Swiss-Prot record:
One Pfam family linked to the record: SSrecog
Identification of the protein by name: FACT complex subunit pob3
Gene: pob3
Record localization: Nucleus; Chromosome
Organism annotation: Aspergillus oryzae (strain ATCC 42149 / RIB 40) (Yellow koji mold)
Acidic residues bias locations: 204-213, 506-528, 542-564
GO biological-process terms attached to the record: DNA repair; DNA replication-dependent chromatin assembly; DNA-templated DNA replication; nucleosome organization; pericentric heterochromatin formation; positive regulation of RNA polymerase II transcription preinitiation complex assembly; silent mating-type cassette heterochromatin formation; subtelomeric heterochromatin formation
GO molecular function terms noted in the UniProt entry: DNA binding; histone binding; nucleosome binding
UniProt xrefs under CDD domains: PH1_SSRP1-like (cd13230), PH2_SSRP1-like (cd13231), PH_TFIIH (cd13229)
Amino acid sequence: MESFDNIYLDLSKQPGKCKLAESGLGWKPSGEGETFTLDSSNVGAAQWSRAAKGFELKILSRSSGVIQLDGFDQEDFERLSKAFKIWYGINVESREHALRGWNWGKAEFTKAELSFNVQNRPAFEVPYSEISNTNLAGKNEVAVELALNTDGADANAQPAGSTKNRGRKAASGPDELVEMRFYIPGTVMKTEKGIKEENGKEENGEEEEEGEEQNAANLFYEMLMEKAEIGDVAGDTFATFLDVLHLTPRGRFDIDMYESSFRLRGKTYDYKIQYSSIKKFFLLPKNDDTHTLIVLGLDPPLRQGQTRYPFLVMQLKLDEEISLELNMTDELMETRYKDKLEPRYEEPIHQVVTKIFRGLSGKKVIMPSKDFVSHHGHSGVKCSIKANEGLLYFLDKSLIFVPKPATYIQVENIAIITMSRVGGAVSASRTFDITVSLKAGMGEHQFSNINREEQQPLEEFFKAKNIRFKNEMSDDAGALLAAALDNDVMGSSDDEGVRADRGSADEDEESIDEDFQAESESDVAEEYDSAHESSGSGSDAEMNDASDGGGDDDDDDEDVDMSEEERPKKKSKVGK
């Protein structure tokens, strides 16, 4: 038996003792933690190289991924290589890392990791178990997202890199790499890079005759998806929903539902999300009575480059029905998902998506509070955060604004809500703002342009939930009335002033012009008609099309129709 002290397993924070025997090897931490063991039959290959804490022994196991043992002395190489040769029948390969610092080289897909080589020497390796997602960021660019450590308690409870974690380096530090990008220009033969490594030499020879040229970045992306098990796994998809509209992130995605995760497949980006990342699950009806929103609160948030999306917002039609049969065995349905899922669904799509997400994730569905109904009988209130228009929903224990920027506020964190108007114009009386101030100096959120008719329903909801609120609008009533009266007085005085300045023009207005013919219009009349038409309903129609509700702008539409009816018909000029 060979024993080595002060050895670190898979970047663990504490050292331990490593022992080698004929039956296998083991590592035991010096403090608390579980002992890691590896059977001799599971040792596939071994590599020796310089590392962070001295020299490292990397073991490529047959079924447990990559195992890294760091902290050896240079003199330990002879003992290790002799033990591996005698007990496991394996030669320990001594490898030197590339130290030139070049950022170009060759990517090699091995059994358990992606290796980036410079001049045939490894610069760095990325285990497939550390890769959470990959996307084509451009024509010749591939983005690789690395898995994040989200549960520090579990990381400290288990030895880093144990087989329970599938080789994950759970004991990561506060700073860690989350994304890297590869620029891969040109084209390659598919058989040279993909099929050869996957199916071996015999099948590769057959494929070479039918080989076709393919974009190198696309082939790299497909290989990485397959190696890291990010893409489709045959037979594992329980259900698939096609072309689902997502408001955040914006686009249409196909949703593939798996046992422990779901995948969003879009034209540009693909996402793989664990059900354990779903912290909140909302079902929110829109005010148009034709759509509903399904909102998933994610932690860690979804990442798209430097942009993070803590909420996933999808929009579904209420009247769209589907028939779906789950791709699941009866045994699995009875043992694990009994009373959670049904073998077959035939109902509106938003209900099917909700039930399957709830059954697979185990999360409770949160719906709008019964204590709040808007003036128009809806669950949401139309408002804005800065320039972004959306809907604010009032739930039993929280408030949520969707779709962008999705904002979630817990009722228990609210210190006071202030209802106020902005500005002194008469138009301000039609809308008001609410400012939600949070406790312990956590900041505030302002929601603007709320319809004046929603004041009473909001006050009743705040009283029902014992939320402190302050109404500052009553203090502004006198100022608004004075402003309105001033506007009327100024308007009338202006009219009198204009009439006084016109002089004899008033007499011309009342007298009959004998030269005027009713059948013809002057150039001046056409000019004024043209100006009137350009300032008409064009902008209003665009605003109505852009609005979500649609029903709140009926008055504007009526005004537009009336103005069009009263407008005289223009007659074209005829040259003499």
